[in-house]
Amino acid sequence: MSTTVRPDEVSSILRKQLAGFESEADVYDVGTVLQVGDGIARVYGLSKAAAGELLEFPNKVMGMALNLEEDNVGAVLFGESNLVKEGDTVKRTGILASIPVGEAMLGRVINPLGEPIDGKGPIETQIRLPLERRAPGVIYRKSVHEPLQTGLKAIDSMIPIGRGQRELIIGDRQTGKTAVAIDTIINQKGKGVFCIYVAIGLKGSTVAQVVNTLEKFGAMEYTTVITATASDPAPLQFIAPFAGATLGEYFRDTGRHALVVYDDLSKQAVAYRQLSLLLRRPPGREAYPGDVFYLHSRLLERAAKITDDIEVARKMNDLPDALKSMVKGGGSLTALPVIETQAGDVSAYIPTNVISITDGQIFLESNLFNSGQRPAINVGISVSRVGGSAQIKAMKKVAGTLRLDLAQFRELEAFSKFGSDLDKTTKAQLDRGARLVEILKQGQYIPMAVEKQVAIIFLGTQGLLDAVDVTRIRKFEEEFLGLLEHKHPEVLKAIAETGTLETDTANKIKEAAQKFIASFNQKAKA
């Protein structure tokens, strides 16, 4: 039986199929790898790539366009260079380098691309923000006026830090720079400050130690650790601080307070120098590229105290669309960059650059560290340019003459080594100075509440400790603060709540100290 083909049926079937045919095609802008090695790839064909745009290489290796030249694009690789070879196809993503942000990041250890590396599973966040962003303009800022307590007596009394400030921690290796930063993070517990610790070029074991310390003191609850270790590619070390700043800006722009520690920026500068030389950019002083100052200035300028006026804050320059509905005023981002010097040379290229960008510096010295003064802060050349207006009144009152007293003590101490015949006044000044130096010493990971600092510094500057043997000052401090806490809690409470040291509060501290010193000295003789 022969079947007859009806032309109208055939044409209707063809019409149906043609109507359902989707002619859409995915269009990718692709290029070819010309050369690869040392974390750098030269790509031909990506004529529309933007500076800072993410590029997709084979084997899930991501890269970023950094050099836009006439005939090729110089890209840095965020993965292993040996996974990419000449002739490989590279895709443009159309996305500028960004990082996921949100509360889910707290308590986690991530790499600079926002990927978790702590084995605690994926991080669920809704928002991505660009790594590079212009700093808020002058109109959107407010002057620094709220204190950020570090818990370290030497810093909170003489080199105070305010929320929104950039304070440099500078010193040779092994002088306690990281310890100062970690103590500050631990001291933010219960103060509503979110912390970001950015480890750049450190050993993996050192980062693990920092994370363990933060966990031990319950600080990981409000902290994110971003790490690009010494074994990670240079491009990751280069972008790590920008990832920290972006995460901090999320908290700052949503009306909260954040603290970011960059440990350390000398290693970021070295990584950037490596990339720049491999990209054939012309070298300048110490072989650093000409824009190494801009590298650090554009990063540190992002730390700011934002205006309380929400309407003004919402008009902030370069505000990402993802944040516009969440903006609140009054937030702050405080930066503590760390710089490592060689043999105490603060006048080298990178240290002078960062000193000129920041609002002050805390200078740590090997000699002081080795002589047992810890934190090993050289008060003479350490300074906080804007923190004074953020210091609480009580501390300003008791520590007003502290810096001068210590400077005079150091001078007299140097002279007293030459001669043994000292008059009474000089001897008294030397004794007072030795006790002040002693009360500023502090153990690691034992930050002290500001009201306790005020009480003990008050005794030192008022000369009440002159009767206590200098070798027993630390013991006295511990026992006296314990006494205040249990027998006179209202004294500490008054300082903490009002931020001032009223005359009757000062008298109560004096009375308690005089009684306690008598019994303390008797105990010592017994």
Swiss-Prot record:
Q: Which reaction does it catalyse?
A: ATP + H2O + 4 H(+)(in) = ADP + phosphate + 5 H(+)(out)
Q: Which residues cross the membrane?
A: none
Compartments reported by the entry: Cell inner membrane
Which molecular function GO terms apply here? ADP binding; ATP binding; proton-transporting ATP synthase activity, rotational mechanism
Report if keyword Nucleotide-binding is assigned: yes
Q: Where does ATP bind?
A: 171-178
What are its E.C. numbers?
Answer: 7.1.2.2
Q: Where is this site: Required for activity?
A: 382
Q: Which UniProt keywords apply?
A: ATP synthesis, ATP-binding, Cell inner membrane, Cell membrane, CF(1), Hydrogen ion transport, Ion transport, Membrane, Nucleotide-binding, Translocase, Transport
What is the membrane topology here?
Peripheral membrane protein
Looking up InterPro entries in the UniProt record yields: ATP_synth_asu-like_sf, ATP_synth_asu_C, ATP_synth_asu_C_sf, ATP_synth_F1_a_nt-bd_dom, ATP_synth_F1_asu, ATPase_a/bsu_AS, ATPase_F1/V1/A1_a/bsu_N, ATPase_F1/V1/A1_a/bsu_N_sf
**Enzyme class label:** translocase
Q: Which Pfam families match?
A: ATP-synt_ab, ATP-synt_ab_C, ATP-synt_ab_N
Could you state one GO cellular component term attached to this entry?
A: proton-transporting ATP synthase complex
Task: Return the PANTHER family for the record.
Answer: ATP SYNTHASE SUBUNIT ALPHA, MITOCHONDRIAL
User: Which family, according to UniProt?
Assistant: Belongs to the ATPase alpha/beta chains family.
- NCBIfam families registered for this protein in UniProt: atpA, PRK13343.1
Subunit comment for this entry? Answer: F-type ATPases have 2 components, CF(1) - the catalytic core - and CF(0) - the membrane proton channel. CF(1) has five subunits: alpha(3), beta(3), gamma(1), delta(1), epsilon(1). CF(0) has four main subunits: a(1), b(1), b'(1) and c(9-12).
> What role does this protein play?
Produces ATP from ADP in the presence of a proton gradient across the membrane. The alpha chain is a regulatory subunit.
Q: What is this protein called?
A: ATP synthase subunit alpha
Organism equals Chlorobium phaeobacteroides (strain DSM 266 / SMG 266 / 2430)
Q: Tell me the name of the encoding gene.
A: atpA
